Amino acid sequence: MPPRASIQETADYLGVSTKTVRNYIADGRLKAVRLGPRLIRVERESVEELMRPIGK
């Protein structure tokens, strides 16, 4: 996964829908940056953090 991935790339990586990724961003579970009016990129570190088991 690239350092900053598209919403579709992130959804494919996590095995969820793009709507779920957008909800994760809105809830603060994933960090994303807006690079233009329609261009959003998700930070790889936040994806790794989301996938890290609790208590580790």
Swiss-Prot record:
InterPro entries in the cross-refs: DNA-bd_dom_put_sf, HTH_17, SinI_DNA-bd
UniProt keyword list: DNA recombination, DNA-binding, Viral genome excision
Top-rank lineage group of the source organism: Viruses
MF-aspect GO terms: DNA binding
Record protein name field: Excisionase
Species the sequence originates in: Mycobacterium phage L5
Protein's UniProt keywords contain Oxidoreductase: no
GO terms of biological process kind: DNA recombination; provirus excision
Role, per record: Excisionase and integrase are necessary for the excision of prophage from the host genome by site-specific recombination at the att site.
Family, per entry: Belongs to the L5likevirus excisionase protein family.
